[in-house]
Design a protein with these regions (language model features):
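Conserved N-terminal entry element of GNAT/NAT acetyltransferase domains
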Residues: 1-15, 154-157
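Conserved acetyl-CoA-binding loop-helix of GNAT-fold acetyltransferases
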Residues: 91, 97-110, 135
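A short beta-loop-alpha structural element at the N-terminal edge
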Residues: 8-22, 29-33
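Conserved active-site alpha-helix within GNAT-family acetyltransferase domains
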Residues: 102, 126-147
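Conserved beta-hairpin
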Residues: 61-75
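Conserved GNAT acetyl-CoA-binding A-motif
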Residues: 112-124
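Conserved acetyl-CoA binding element of GNAT-fold acetyltransferases
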Residues: 82-93
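Conserved GNAT-fold acetyl-CoA-binding loop/helix
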Residues: 28-54
Length: 157
């Protein structure tokens, strides 16, 4: 595992948009490989999807994930009176499977426990992230053929 003390978050700014697009693309390119599209078509589609996603969550806490001071990912969290909604967590490819995502989710779990709120999220049904969230204690709470709804409940005392 990477040194967790070198992991931090900062607020995303408009200047981060090129980096955020890079992170988003790194999570989507593989699934587009089977479409038979050119690289230009893939990039245009990803940019369109990225901009639509940006407009979908205007109220969320949009954070840049920093490791050793370098931007390595993004975390989108929507907090309301009933729950904490994890809208997105994504790391650049070379920073995945190093324990960084787990550390951030565990920090969010501590926040949820302190607030007495569940954490909810949606994940693509076929994504390896389903197993990641299950290992962290999330359970399936609904969904459809495309997306699973998952929930983590803080322990009650």
């Amino acid at each position: 595992m990477q040194n967790e003390t070198n992991l931090s978050l900062r607020e995303a700014t408009p200047e981060d948009e090129p980096f955020l697009l890079e992170v988003y693309a790194s999570t989507r390119l593989e699934e587009l490989d089977g479409f038979g599209w050119s690289d230009d078509q893939k990039q245009a589609f990803i940019k369109m999807q990225f901009l639509a996603r940006q407009r979908t969550y205007p109220r969320v806490d949009d954070r840049i994930i920093l490791f050793e001071g370098r931007p390595v990912g993004r975390m989108l969290v929507d907090r309301n009176d009933e729950s904490i909604l994890l809208r997105d967590i994504a790391l650049l490819t070379e920073f995945r499977n190093a324990g960084l995502g787990s550390r951030l989710i565990k920090d969010l779990m501590k926040e949820a426990t302190d607030a007495g709120k569940p954490i909810q999220l949606h994940v693509v049904t076929s994504s390896p992230a389903v197993r990641f969230y299950e290992r962290l204690g999330f359970s399936r709470s609904g969904g459809d053929n495309a997306y699973l709804e998952m929930k983590w409940l803080p322990a009650t005392s």
